[in-house]
């Protein structure tokens, strides 16, 4: 399975699982070594999920557990998914010290 196929699977699982938990998606951003192109065989996938609105902890936890489990089972690579809401992203997207700024600068919206 190549890079593009894995990315398509990751996006599909995130979108499908978000629908299940009524999570509105604003953006899905791949960042880190996979986005920069300097990844190795052992690199994980770093995903920033920007939601339309803030979601409660319980929903966030259920979403993360289910989506990560499905993704890892399907592509057999480790993955980190970070969730922030649109307001956080918009406020901090120009600050490199924040995850929003890092993802905006080096990330690829998928």
Task: Describe the predicted segments one by one.
Residues 46-50:
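Short beta-strand->loop micro-motif that forms the acidic, two-metal-ion catalytic signature
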Residues 1-27, 36-41, 51-110:
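Catalytic core of pol beta-like nucleotidyltransferases
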